[in-house]
């Protein structure tokens, strides 16, 4: 199927945004500069995205790998599968270069942070919370466990390694899960 001029412009803008954000950060990548690099008008950019935050959310969505749904019925196995997927996904050099810039921008821009959480992190968080809730329902995790704290304990080490090192040690997902699971009687 042939691409339309509009879809070609969309792709060019996304690629230009990825390049400029990687070089300058989100604050330094103006919509004018993105349009110039993409070879389109600024109006074309705004026809596809209402603002730079919306464009940046699409940039992240373009580079991330959405996790599959894990539903084996065994919460520990599902968590290991999901955490392993997250540890191994998005190892591209482009994502490694962009991630600290995106997180820094999100820290200073609550509206962007909320859009990122809803569009990019939300599905991951929802799946972890669902699996933890299944563990509580099955009695393999305590009813008193705070699910949000569990989410942070499981996801934090992987995200930290991804941000600071660009890669996650191969055994980290299993180690984090074993320590988390071992905490509960």
Label each PLM-derived region with a short phrase.
Residues 38-49:
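Short hydrophobic/aromatic patch on the recognition helix
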Residues 13, 28, 51-56, 66-67, ...:
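Short amphipathic alpha-helical segment with a characteristic S/N-K-E followed by hydrophobic residues
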Residues 81, 87-88, 126, 130-137, ...:
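C-terminal peripheral helix-coil segments that are non-catalytic and often amphipathic
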Residues 1-24, 28-37, 54:
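Basic, helix-initiating cap at the start of DNA-binding domains
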Residues 115-120, 137-152, 170-171:
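All-alpha amphipathic helical-bundle segments outside canonical DNA-binding/catalytic cores
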Residues 48-49, 116, 120, 155, ...:
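Tryptophan-centric aromatic hotspots in well-structured domains and transmembrane helices
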Residues 77, 92-93, 97, 111-137:
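Amphipathic alpha-helical packing segments from all-alpha helical-bundle domains
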Residues 67-99, 150:
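Hydrophobic alpha-helical connector segments
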């Amino acid at each position: 199927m042939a691409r339309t001029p509009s879809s070609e412009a969309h792709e060019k803008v996304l690629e230009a945004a990825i390049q400029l954000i990687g070089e300058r950060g989100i604050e330094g990548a103006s919509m004018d500069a993105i349009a110039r690099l993409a070879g389109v008008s600024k109006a074309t950019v705004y026809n596809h995205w209402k603002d730079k935050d919306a464009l940046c959310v699409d940039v992240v969505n373009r580079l991330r790998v959405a996790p599959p749904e894990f539903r084996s019925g065994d919460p520990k196995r599902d968590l290991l599968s999901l955490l392993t997927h997250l540890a191994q996904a998005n190892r591209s050099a482009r994502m490694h270069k962009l991630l600290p810039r995106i997180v820094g921008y999100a820290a200073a821009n609550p509206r962007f942070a909320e859009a990122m959480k809803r569009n990019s992190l939300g599905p991951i968080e929802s799946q972890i919370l669902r699996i933890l809730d299944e563990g509580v329902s099955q009695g393999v995790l305590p009813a008193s466990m705070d699910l949000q704290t569990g989410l942070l304990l499981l996801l934090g080490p992987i995200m930290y390694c991804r941000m600071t090192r660009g890669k996650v040690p191969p055994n980290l997902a299993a180690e984090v899960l074993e320590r988390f699971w071992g905490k509960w009687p």
